[in-house]
Amino acid sequence: VVLTVVLALATADLHQQEVRQRFQLLVNERYSRLEERFEDQEQRLGSLRRFFVNSNTVSREEFDGFAQPLLMRARAYAWAPRIFRDQRQAFEQQVSLQRGAPFSIRELNDNGTLLPAGERDEYVPVLYSQTQSLIGSPLGFDLLAQPLRRSTVERAYRSGSIAVSQPMLLVGVEPAYAMGVLLVAPVTRPHTAQMTYNEPYGFVMAVISMRQLVADGLPKPARDNLVMQIVDTSDTQQRVLYESDNAVADSGLEAIRRLTLGDHVYALSLRPSQVFAQANHSAVTSILVMGCLLSLLLSALLYVLVSQRQRAVRLVQQRTGQLHQREYELRGAHGQLRSVLNAATQVAI
């Protein structure tokens, strides 16, 4: 039993080490994949931004031709120019003429319906859009009409680099992919010797669904070894950007990694799922059961051996007693025979 307990403890320790190693391998692989995807989205938006920077003008056909190949794990790419109050009417008329259909700068009302935008000093309406969505593009939607989008545009304007929105419900996206973020990058004219700084004249944008970006290509929840959660640490409310819906295993294992996208930092939390726990169950219980059974068998064997030895000793003692009795009887008979012989000898003499 003691040997069984020692063996079980050693096996349990070895099993824990192996489980931790397997978990770390899965964590490293998942983290590397997500980090690569996040960096890839920044690079794709950066290439679209450079396309505008290096072009005097970009037509809708040119935009579609360049943006369509970029649509990998992104719901849409869009171009939104800056339009001021006194430019609005002429801009809407020009775009309506180019499209051959009415166009207006729009905003969402309280019911989520797009309506003509109210008067403001500045607008950033979506003019071009290349999307995977079957719903279509919300052309004319003003990014400055809603606080979360306005904040993202303003941060991109101030920093001159890619800004990422807080988690939000995306416009023009199927409900299954509606939760996500916007990546916004400012577009300026190339610097010249006379003008080293130019204000952005518009913004390129990537519409990112977290479900598509994170879960695409990964195992189904019922077969995934890891439970994932991505939290926006740049947000004071620590909002959850993505959370898988598979069951968490009863384990103390957890790994937290840092992911960056634009100007936001995310905490990636990874824990083992029940699928992982079932595939890596411990053999300690089996060892204890087998050890106990083996101990019982050895005890039974030892009992049988001892019983047989005691029986053999008793048989030997019994046989020895019988031999001693026989020897005593033979000695008595021998004495009697000698007495008879002696008497016969005397008579003969």
Give residue ranges: language-model regions:
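Membrane-interface helix-start motif
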Residues: 271-291
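Membrane-proximal amphipathic alpha-helices
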Residues: 9-45, 52-60
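Short hydrophobic secondary-structure edge segments in sensory/regulatory modules of signaling proteins
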Residues: 45, 77, 348-349
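Extreme N-terminal signal-anchor transmembrane helix of membrane signaling/transducer proteins, especially
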Residues: 1-14, 289-299
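Juxtamembrane interface at the cytosolic side of transmembrane helices
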Residues: 299-321
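Intrinsically disordered, low-complexity polar/acidic regions
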Residues: 20, 24-28, 53-270
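PAS/LOV and related PAS-like sensory modules
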Residues: 323-349
